[in-house]
Every structure is written in structure tokens, then in C-alpha cells.
Amino acid sequence: MLVTQEYLEREHMKYIIMAGGTYENWEKPKHLSEVCGEPIVARTIRLLRENGVTDIAISTTNVRAFLGFGVTILRHHNPYTLPKDADASTPWLDAFYPMTEPVCYIFGDVVFSPRAIKTIVETDTGSIEFFASAKPLPSIYPKHWAEPFAFKVKDTSRFFKAIKDTNKFDKQGLFKRQPIAWELWQVIKGTPLNKVDYTNYTVINDYTCDIDEPEDIAYFDRILKTSD
């Protein structure tokens, strides 16, 4: 569906860039890391605005660090912590700022291509849509596995009920790992929980990907110089 400015005004939706959590491999919030001289969150904001989006916010615990980007800052306690040399033991699903109105949650540590943001903005949903990469992955993609990028949510009641259900299923031991975006999407879809299901979502397959380590920045510096 081609989304016009009239559509954006009629079907109003807030876009929240999720920039919470603590990542001990990073000296500052990794969402503020610069790619080609531009902070990742600033790049995402710019690309959203280039696609007609005006209602943009950043959700974070570290409010002061994210001032100055010209968008609303939503204080949100996200206890998720990723240690330097261990897996996270705190819940990832607390990352979503509570909303009752339509919202698009954009993962704040993802370096998006212009086409990726355009796809997210122009994809309509009557309920909930999920955006991620998928195998077979393109050669320009920096990893060997798929990564999640965003949730677009019209039915917020259903979305937050799914989060509660996912946490409940986790306590019952129905997942093989701590639930993250993939497991949440399985609960939303109603598919079996004992195997991660990388299907039935809007696929974005280009260089769009999140950053895990400081060394990832150099890769995107090289890619963006020739791709954008």
C-alpha cells in the first residue's frame, strides 16, 4: 500500500525509538553511536521525517543523554542489562513503552536503510505487524542470522496482552531461551512455542541490522559510504 501524507494524517501513529537498557560493552548508550558521523537515533529520526512522519519520540531511562534531537523523550524504566561476557538475565520484553493509541516501536540500535524505513512507514496493518530480516540473507547483510527491527501496532490491547502471555509462558518453561521479539511474535501469531519461527512477517533484507559490538560501527561506515 502506498501511504500518502493524507493517509499519515488520517491514520495517526506515534513512532517510538526504543533506546533503553544497559549494554556493558559500550561506554555510552549504543543507540548514540555515530555511523558516518551521525548518531544512529538521529539517522532514524531523519529517515522517518523524510517519509512524512512527524510524531516521533525516544523511550529511555537515560533522558539527559537523548536531549537535543528535537523529539519527545519518554522516560521509561527498562531493566534489561547485557553483561560484557554473559547472557542477559533481565527481561527484554519490558522494553516497550506502554501505549493505548496506535504506535510503531522502532528498535533504537538498528542502522536502517532508507528503503527499510520507507517499508515500515508504508506498511499498513489492522492489528500488529512485525518487521525483521530473514534467510536467505543478502551478501550485504552483516550477520549470519536474522534480526528484528520494529513492531507496528494498531491493536495495543492485543499487543500488551501478548507480552503478558509471553512472560507467563516463559515462567512455565515453554521457550528454549529467554523470550525476545521472535517469541513475542510467535505468541501474537499463535504458532508453537518450542521452536523459533522465522516466518510470516514483513521482511527487510538489505544492510539494515542492529549493532552488537563497537566493532560493528566500522562495517556500517564502509557500507553507508557506498549504499546511501
What are these regions (language model features)?
Residues 2-28:
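N-terminal nucleotide-binding beta1-loop-alpha1 segment
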Residues 14-18, 41, 56:
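Hydrophobic targeting segments
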Residues 39-53:
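A short, N-terminal amphipathic alpha-helix
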Residues 54-55, 101:
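Short acidic/polar active-site loop segments enriched in Thr and Asp
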Residues 68-104, 111-114:
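Short phosphate-binding loop-to-helix
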Residues 199-228:
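C-terminal catalytic/acceptor-binding lobe
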